[in-house]
UniProtKB/Swiss-Prot annotation:
The lineage of its organism: Eukaryota, Metazoa, Ecdysozoa, Arthropoda, Hexapoda. This is Esterase GA18864. Its EC number is 3.1.2.-. The keyword Ion transport does not apply. Belongs to the LovG family. It comes from Drosophila pseudoobscura pseudoobscura (Fruit fly).
Amino acid sequence: MTNNDAAVEAPSSSRASSSKQQPKLEITEKVRVLCLHGYRQDGDAFKNKLGSFRKFTSKYAEFVFISAPHIAAPLESAAEPVPEQRSWWANKDDGTFKGTNKGGPAFGFQDSLRLVEEAWKTQGPFQGLLGFSQGACFVGLICGLAKKKLTSIRPEFAVLSSGFVSGSLVHMSAYEEPVSIPTLHIYGSSDEIIPKDMSALLASHFKNVEVLEHGGGHYFPATAQQKQTYINFFQDRLQEYLEHLELQQSSSVSFIESGAEDNDDDGDANDAEVAAATAAAGSDLDDSD
């Protein structure tokens, strides 16, 4: 929760029992987004890289960054691993990862999925996911798994920058059903690490898609050219979230009022039963005289 959180109390019902208290719904004034970094990054590095982006959208969204559980294999076999260089999974037999690799394994993927599920549960609530490169690939997989109810994560929207479809065979089933949540797909026309066609292919697996293509390479753009797109996207997501909470609150109030009416009906029935019993008793007394 942010410091801007506010509690909204449901309107009281004159028919509700005084012993019953109306529920309180906490309205989060910003949507909360769990962020997944790229290969050989970590949560802190990714957070720093998204400084301008976070500033653009700070009115509407709060971003939480976590780090992958695996240390990436060193670039050279004789080199020492760098703790700050993290990996969500490896898709090559030598323990490294390459986005363009096809048909390889997914070493460590389940560990990473459990970590993200735990973060979603313990650091939430969250409404959305955001990822860059391998992290965006991961976000796409999570959305597909959520569609099939194969993960406890339930994103309401997602942002995928320089994303791609995983080539690992064990991931193929995650792309079997199109995903309907709103998504923003960001990619560069000059990206040589993840060519834009790969990112466009990932976008094709979603139904409610907005695409932001920039003229650069493999990075998350955050200049004045992209600012309004980001603001509009998160403004819409916040509006949807608040409307959902308003509907939820309305349903809760209706449920309580319905319960109060049932109690009143029960009371009326009891009164009728008492009156009938009293009348019957009086009749018996008259007969005995």
